[in-house]
Amino acid sequence: MRSAAADTVSGIIEKWSASFNKLDADARASLYSKHAFFFGSNPSLYRGNEGVAAYFNALPRWSSPAVQFNDVRTAPVGADLINFAGTASFFINEGEPPLSVKITWVIAREDGDWKIVSHHVSSKTPLI
């Protein structure tokens, strides 16, 4: 039986994936907290859902984007806080191998809705 935390994360992943596949940066940014910290695929720290929107709007307009989440792990930290870790594989151009990264989110209830408050991706290739 799936937990409530797993169901919450599954719903966010579904919305996140749909907005990535459509290149809808504003819909994706709406999943983030107004207080979010965001480390994506470049070294900059983006803050708040406006910063997250700026990051997503600056990404290339890929020809056939798709994302797949695997190895999903969730852990409720409290009634209003969930940890998530997994692997995200980005298929950005048809025929090219995916870009796969480790991804973590901290998800919190904000104004009655679940929002991503911390987003971090890192290379699957060991750095050390």
Predicted regions and their residues:
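A beta-strand edge to alpha-helix "cap/lid" segment located at domain peripheries
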Residues: 1-27, 37-128
